């Protein structure tokens, strides 16, 4: 295999496409469906909450361990949003 057919470890670290990022200065930007904070109704942009780092998950290996239950601080009468309730 010639040297031009593969990248060395140091080339891979400096590559702007490492870990699927477009550039290395990605901080807490929107990751859409790739974000661990993504929800199609509540957070379609995949933005991280204040104080948390946005990390993309590997869609082929990531598995939720349990169903996510929203915390409503004891309020039982708050209806969950649905796509039918969205305003045009």
UniProtKB/Swiss-Prot annotation:
Keywords: Cytoplasm. The keyword Transmembrane does not apply. It is found in: Cytoplasm. GO terms for cellular component: cytoplasm. Residues 1-23 are annotated as: Disordered. Its main location: cytoplasm. Pfam families: NpwBP. Belongs to the AIM4 family. This is Altered inheritance of mitochondria protein 4. The gene is AIM4.
């Amino acid at each position: 295999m010639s040297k031009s057919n593969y990248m060395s470890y140091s080339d891979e670290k400096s590559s702007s496409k490492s870990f699927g990022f477009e550039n290395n200065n990605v901080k807490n930007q929107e990751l859409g469906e790739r974000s661990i904070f993504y929800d199609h109704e509540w957070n379609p942009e995949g933005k991280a909450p204040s104080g948390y780092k946005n990390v993309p998950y590997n869609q082929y290996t990531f598995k939720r361990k349990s169903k996510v239950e929203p915390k409503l601080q004891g309020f039982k009468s708050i209806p969950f949003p649905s796509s039918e309730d969205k305003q045009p």
